[in-house]
From Swiss-Prot:
Pathway linked to the protein: Pyrimidine metabolism; UMP biosynthesis via salvage pathway; UMP from uracil: step 1/1
Single Gene Ontology BP annotation: UMP salvage
Intrachain disulfide bonds: none
Required co-factors: Mg(2+)
Species the sequence originates in: Limosilactobacillus reuteri (strain DSM 20016)
Task performed by this protein: Catalyzes the conversion of uracil and 5-phospho-alpha-D-ribose 1-diphosphate (PRPP) to UMP and diphosphate.
EC number of this enzyme: 2.4.2.9
Keyword terms of this UniProt record: Allosteric enzyme, Glycosyltransferase, GTP-binding, Magnesium, Nucleotide-binding, Transferase
Free-text activity regulation comment from the record: Allosterically activated by GTP.
Protein name in the entry: Uracil phosphoribosyltransferase
Length: 211
């Protein structure tokens, strides 16, 4: 069973509170989402494997640690997921980037896939799927399914979001129990329009200043 973790680091919680405020502007929102994403990347990558390596410092030869195992690919769910990419690549600069495009039907609240572009070696990588919101879970599940259809394993997937609703967390964990889920905030519920309460509004609109 994959893990579900609410990242309670004080800086993450402080910055999340700031972007929940409806009065902050696009520039501040975008920059702070990037900062939160960097802090989240540190936590999401916590269990990456290490191996011993022999190096020589200016003083002596020594055995130290370096990353081992699968390299990382960051997969934002378009469009809002793009806002989390730069923060993560600040910490993992060698990560490859893939894209899965989704839009939500405002009447049915169902996601629709319109674009997929992934690295050629996607099946050989540890996947960090990113989207600021985990509401109904529909977009996350469709992204996971798109990756599985292309040969990726659930056990190599980690989903990271800024805010999650209990309904979305349950839906993803029921459907894909081996996928790890990380969120900065677990909120109360979804309203009748499918928005997370209290949430932070529409993350894509607030990131890009458009609707």
């Amino acid at each position: 069973m994959g893990k579900f973790e609410v990242l309670d680091h004080p800086l993450i919680q402080h910055k999340l509170t700031m972007i929940r405020d409806k009065n902050v502007g696009t520039k501040f929102f975008r920059e702070t989402v990037k900062e939160i994403s960097t802090l989240m990347a540190y936590e999401v990558a916590r269990d990456m494997p290490l191996k011993d390596v022999e190096i020589e410092t200016p003083i002596a030869k020594t055995t130290q640690k370096e990353l081992a195992g699968k390299k990382v690919a960051i997969i934002p769910i378009l469009r809002a997921g793009i806002g989390m990419v730069d923060g993560m690549t600040d910490l993992i600069p060698a990560a490859k980037i893939g894209f899965i495009g989704m839009y939500r039907d405002e009447e049915t609240l169902k996601p629709h896939e319109y674009f997929v572009k992934l690295p050629n070696d996607i099946t050989e990588r540890q996947l960090f799927i990113v989207d600021p919101m985990l509401a109904t879970g529909g977009s996350a599940m469709m992204a996971i399914e798109a990756l599985k259809k292309r040969g990726c394993s659930e056990k190599n997937m980690k989903f990271a979001c800024l805010v999650a609703a209990p309904e979305g967390v349950k839906a993803v964990r029921d459907a894909y129990p081996d996928v790890d889920i990380y969120t900065a905030g677990l909120d109360d519920h979804l309203n009748e329009d499918g928005y997370i309460v209290p949430g932070l509004g529409d993350a894509g609109d607030r990131l890009f200043g458009t609707k």
